[in-house]
Structure formats: structure tokens, C-alpha cells
Curated annotation (Swiss-Prot):
GO cellular component: host cell membrane; membrane; virion component
Record has Transmembrane as a keyword: yes
Role played: Plays essential roles both in the entry of the viral genome into the bacterial host and in budding process. The formation of the G3P-G6P complex termed adsorption complex is essential for correct termination of filamentous phage assembly.
Annotated transmembrane regions: 20-40, 44-64, 66-86
Subunit annotation: Interacts with G3P; this interaction is required for proper integration of G3P and G6P into the virion.
Membrane topology, as annotated: Multi-pass membrane protein
Similarity remark: Belongs to the inovirus G6P protein family.
Keywords: Host membrane, Membrane, Transmembrane, Transmembrane helix, Viral penetration into host cytoplasm, Viral penetration into host cytoplasm via pilus retraction, Virion, Virus entry into host cell
Lineage, broadest ranks: Viruses, Monodnaviria, Loebvirae, Hofneiviricota, Faserviricetes
Annotated compartments: Virion; Host membrane
Alphabetical GO biological process terms: symbiont entry into host cell
Protein name (record): Head virion protein G6P
Length: 95
């Protein structure tokens, strides 16, 4: 007969395994972040900004941004995020 978590006093073991997984995940992600911080920035990206790179991208990229309405889409995403956060604050996270 298999014993599930929470039966016959093994609930503590299940919590321990869950905590062990969380600790392993945290250490793994920290190691990946550490390795990424060791990588040097490419020379072509030094002193660049997103606006400067988009300005140098050419008319084709700007045409696609205009056709797909990237600007209004970002405004709508920002408005949705503000609405979500404001709703959470005003309803104390219930709704």
C-alpha cells in the first residue's frame, strides 16, 4: 500500500522534500545568475541605448513597429498592469 503525503506521519517528510527542492532551485538560479554576471558586455553594445539602437535599425524596423502598433500595445499592457495592481491594493488581495 502506498503512503501519500499527510498520512501516517509523513507530512513532515513531504514538507522537507518541498523545501529541499526550493533550496536546490534557488541555488541553481543563483549560480546561473553569477555566471551571467561574469560574461563581458560586447563592444558593440557599450554606450548604446534602446532608442539609439532602434533609431539605427532602419526604416524597415520602424515600419513593422508602426504596422503592428507596438507603441499602443505597450500602453495597453501598462494600463492593464496598473489596473491589476490597483485592484489588488484596493480589495486587499481578495479579488
Amino acid at each position: 500500500m502506498a503512503v501519500a503525503c499527510g498520512q501516517d506521519g509523513v507530512a513532515g517528510d513531504c514538507r522537507f522534500l518541498g523545501d529541499l527542492f526550493v533550496m536546490w532551485l534557488e541555488q541553481s538560479l543563483s549560480a546561473i545568475l553569477y555566471v551571467l554576471t561574469l560574461l563581458p558586455m560586447p563592444d558593440f553594445m557599450k554606450g548604446q541605448s534602446i532608442g539609439g539602437m532602434l533609431g539605427n535599425a532602419g526604416s524597415t524596423i520602424l515600419w513593422f513597429a508602426d504596422v503592428f502598433m507596438i507603441g499602443p500595445a505597450l500602453v495597453m499592457i501598462g494600463a492593464a498592469m496598473i489596473f491589476f495592481l490597483l485592484r489588488r491594493v484596493l480589495t486587499l488581495g481578495i479579488w
